[in-house]
């Protein structure tokens, strides 16, 4: 699952406790098209296999997995640099994980839509309070005894 795993040397009498950390990073991606509720889409490294992903999710995150399907998404090469040479984005692997029976996943709504009616009233209130504060600030100071503000040090 992990590349270049170096285990510590064996020492007599010492316990062989090992913490296994992977050097794989997976990204949970919002699907572009509608998918069933039990299917989750990930973006994974090219070296990671479907068995690795299944073990990763089951052992580290305790997520029961029914099936894993993968495909390779080729990076686009439409962009060109200052020398008119094509620049290719790197390829990546997309994995579709089907969760076990009864498990569902819905992508969280991180930025909910705001009600425009509530937004407009708060803007009007903020503008009216701002104008009241400005008028109070620009009014004459009673301690100056009628002397204008421009006539000061």
Curated annotation (Swiss-Prot):
Localization, UniProt: Mitochondrion
Assembly, per entry: Component of the mitochondrial ribosome large subunit (39S) which comprises a 16S rRNA and about 50 distinct proteins.
Gene3D superfamilies, sorted: 3.30.70.330
One cellular component term from this protein's GO annotations in UniProt: mitochondrial large ribosomal subunit
Region entry Disordered, spans: 131-153
Domain of life (superkingdom): Eukaryota
InterPro entries: Nucleotide-bd_a/b_plait_sf, Ribosomal_uL23-like, Ribosomal_uL23/eL15/eS24_sf
Transmembrane segments: none
GO BP, sorted A to Z: mitochondrial translation
A Pfam family this chain is assigned to: Ribosomal_L23
One function term, GO molecular function aspect: structural constituent of ribosome
Keyword tags: Mitochondrion, Ribonucleoprotein, Ribosomal protein
The protein's name: Large ribosomal subunit protein uL23m
Family: Belongs to the universal ribosomal protein uL23 family.
């Amino acid at each position: 699952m992990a590349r270049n795993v170096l285990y510590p040397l064996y020492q007599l009498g010492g316990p062989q406790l090992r913490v296994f950390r992977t050097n794989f990073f997976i990204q949970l991606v919002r699907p572009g098209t509608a998918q069933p509720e039990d299917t989750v889409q990930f973006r994974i490294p090219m070296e990671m296999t479907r068995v690795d992903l299944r073990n990763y999710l089951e052992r580290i995150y305790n997520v029961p997995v029914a099936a894993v399907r993968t495909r390779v998404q080729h990076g686009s090469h439409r962009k060109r640099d200052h020398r008119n040479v094509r620049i290719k984005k790197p390829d990546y692997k997309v994995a579709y994980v089907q969760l076990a029976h009864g498990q569902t996943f819905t992508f969280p709504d991180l930025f909910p839509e705001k009600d425009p009616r509530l937004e407009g009233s708060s803007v009007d209130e903020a503008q009216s309070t701002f104008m009241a504060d400005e008028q109070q600030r620009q009014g004459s100071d009673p301690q100056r005894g009628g002397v204008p503000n421009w006539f000061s040090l």
